[in-house]
Amino acid sequence: MIRLVTCDIDGTLLHGTETAIDAETLGEIRRLREKGVLFCPASGRQYHSLRRLFRPVADELAFICENGSVVFGPGSPGPVWGKVPLDRTEAIRLCRDIMTQPGCVINASGENTCYACNCDEEFLRHMREDVGNITEVVDDPEDIPEEIIKVSAFCRGGADAAIGYFKERWEAAFQVAVAGEQWIDFTLADKGTGLEIVCRAMGVRPEEVISFGDNYNDIPILSMVGRPYIMENAAEELREMFPNHCRRVAEVLKTL
């Protein structure tokens, strides 16, 4: 029996230029909750950004945020079920390295605030208005006033051009992953870590979970659950790894 649904956002629940969850999906989330099935977004996004995206049902959801680095239970706001902070000294060293790279901007995440350094006004506008993050500006990484759970490099020249440099220097200390055309994330957690936290808090077994994803950073969570689904437009390698494919998440939710 399925007791938990986890779902990636960008490329899975939202496609192309979509910026809002459609009414059909929100209706299915409500219906499943009435049946005792919890819906849990699993994303690299911040908690505030995810709550804004799911505003009509946000209090009823758990959230795997920042690629598994912090997990919130249902509520307004929900309790922190778990988080995986970075070593502060290493995180600040990483931030300083990012600052030396041409065209790279630091975006370091706390529990529900991100901290930008060496950025311009357009970057701030994008993070606050388009992404929906609570974003503060700091003059120096040392000024970040809380535990750092994720460091991101915004690479104006593209993540693919910078990933080799950062992997060579930092893969021994962090999980280093491309998180978008211009983003590279550094964490100690992944979405599978987040799922473990949710399952422990709920008393749910992985085989009682159905998960949806579309990219390589979804592999840890898809590999753990009883019913993994990959989007039909995902990379061929991923479609071969996970035989259950779907075009739209709502189509599968209706069958539960």
Predicted regions and their residues:
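Short hydrophobic/aromatic-enriched beta-strand-loop microsegments
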Residues: 60-66, 84, 128, 176, ...
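Hydrophobic packing residues within well-ordered alpha-helices of enzyme cores
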Residues: 50-54, 162, 166, 221, ...
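Active-site phosphate-binding/coordination module
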Residues: 23-122
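Short active-site oxyanion
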Residues: 36-40, 59-61, 149-151, 207-209, ...
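Residue-level signal for inorganic ion chemistry
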Residues: 32, 67, 151, 195, ...
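Mg2+-dependent phosphoryl-transfer enzymes with acidic/Ser/Thr/Gly-rich catalytic loops
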Residues: 1-4, 22, 184-256
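Conserved acidic, metal-coordinating active-site core of Asp-based
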Residues: 101-212, 216-218, 233
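Asp-based phosphoryl-transfer active-site loop
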Residues: 3-18, 222
